[in-house]
A protein has these predicted regions:
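Hydrophobic, well-ordered beta-alpha structural blocks that scaffold small-molecule cofactor pockets
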Residues: 1-51
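A short, aliphatic-rich alpha-helical micro-motif
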Residues: 9, 71-73
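Residue-level detector of alpha-helix initiation sites
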Residues: 20-22, 85-86, 132
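Short loop/edge segments at beta-strand edges and connector loops
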Residues: 41, 60-63, 106
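Glycine-rich, highly charged phosphate/nucleotide-binding loops
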Residues: 53-70
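ADP-ribose/adenylate-binding Rossmann-like module
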Residues: 77-83, 88-114
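E1/E1-like adenylate-forming module used to activate ubiquitin-like modifiers
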Residues: 102-154
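An accessory alpha-helical subdomain
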Residues: 132-215
């Protein structure tokens, strides 16, 4: 499996065929990105209705027909989320004809891409996929990682500032790498996870001050 990060723009369209629970989960992720989301479905979930009433996506309250083929051709990504196999087969055939990347909820083998479960812990963004092992595994791993890495929410913003300081003080890429290997190794990382970030932060500040004094 090749994992990629898609960068969308305001001019990109992401199209959803279907309006059930799967479409809702996929749409929830896309609504956080700078793109236009369009849903074609005669029925949508209550949560999707709430988003629609807030003008967060475009809803075509109808079944998929040939009228929407041009929309498929123009979209950046296509999510096929209906419970009708014949409709899903037809929409997939159209997307294949025009080279549109698709994700099909009822057939993982037909997917050009998958949507991993994601975790945001401050500046840390983690994608999780059990490779079709089931959503339960994803949820358990997600919960474990949220607990395990919660301390990084405090540490990462400060480390970003320190990284810029070290860049200014140490021009050499190799020497900078050596600095971080020396002062932010596995033992320091484990200490951060155990809630000892203030101690590690103090040590890093001391090391940076030492470099500043020498220069």
């Amino acid at each position: 499996m090749l994992s990629l990060t898609l960068q969308t723009t305001a001019s990109d369209t992401i199209l959803f065929i279907g309006g059930g629970a799967v479409a809702e989960r996929r749409l929830a992720l896309c609504l956080q990105e700078p793109c236009q989301c369009i849903v074609i479905s005669p029925v949508i979930t209550e949560q999707m209705k709430s988003w629609y009433e807030d003008d967060r996506f475009v809803w075509h309250n109808t079944i998929f027909t040939d009228e929407y083929i041009d929309m498929v051709k123009r979209c950046k990504l296509l999510f096929i989320c209906t419970d009708n196999t014949a409709v899903n087969d037809y929409v997939e055939a159209i997307s294949r004809k025009y080279g549109v990347w698709l994700n099909r909820a009822d057939d993982a083998t037909s997917c050009d891409f998958t949507v991993p479960s994601t975790i945001d812990i401050g500046d840390l963004h983690i994608a999780i996929s059990a490779n079709n092992g089931g959503p339960r595994i994803n949820r358990l791993v997600k919960r474990d990682m949220m607990n395990r890495y919660s301390e990084l929410q405090i540490a990462i913003p400060r480390l970003k500032i320190m990284r810029e300081e070290v860049k200014l003080l140490i021009p050499s890429v190799e020497e900078r790498s050596q600095f971080w290997r020396t002062y932010l190794g596995e033992s320091e990382f484990q200490a951060i996870l155990k809630g000892q970030w203030p101690l590690i932060e103090e040590k890093l500040h001391h090391a940076i001050s030492g470099i500043r004094t020498k220069s």
